[in-house]
Amino acid sequence: MSYADDIIIVGVGDNISLFYEEIVDVWSGYAWDEPIESELAGYPVNTIYTSDHGAGSYAGFIVTKEETIINNPSLVKNFIVASLKGWDYALENKEDAAKYAIERNPSLSYEHQLLAMGVLEDLTNYHGTRGCFNK
């Protein structure tokens, strides 16, 4: 018998109240979103980071075709430089970044966005250099 025999997969959509009501034991999400939402709603959580188990997160990756890198390297370089400048600004000006997000989506919580910026700062510097996995 394996641990997998004890697991029941439940389709929950985005109804996180099923987690709050302990109908489901585990909730998958982004470190800068659902754990903060849960804490702010009064539900303490234990966050398990995929990076602690050898897997990174695909969110925030910049992906392009090898063909684009070969045929238009300046476009690729300029896009990456601009993206990193945006990250640097947002992480150095968390309040502005949170306000900007709310301007684009008024249903967002300022407190949540501000806390999310702190989590994102840790995640974007995971390997010691923002924007790089290895040197």
Question: Where do the protein language model's features map onto the residues?
Answer:
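A bilobed periplasmic-binding-protein/Venus flytrap-type ligand-binding module shared by bacterial periplasmic
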Residues: 58-75
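Active-site-proximal beta-strand/loop segments in catalytic clefts of secreted hydrolases
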Residues: 30, 50-52, 101
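Solvent-exposed loop/turn segments at secondary-structure junctions
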Residues: 15-17, 33-36, 51-55, 68-69
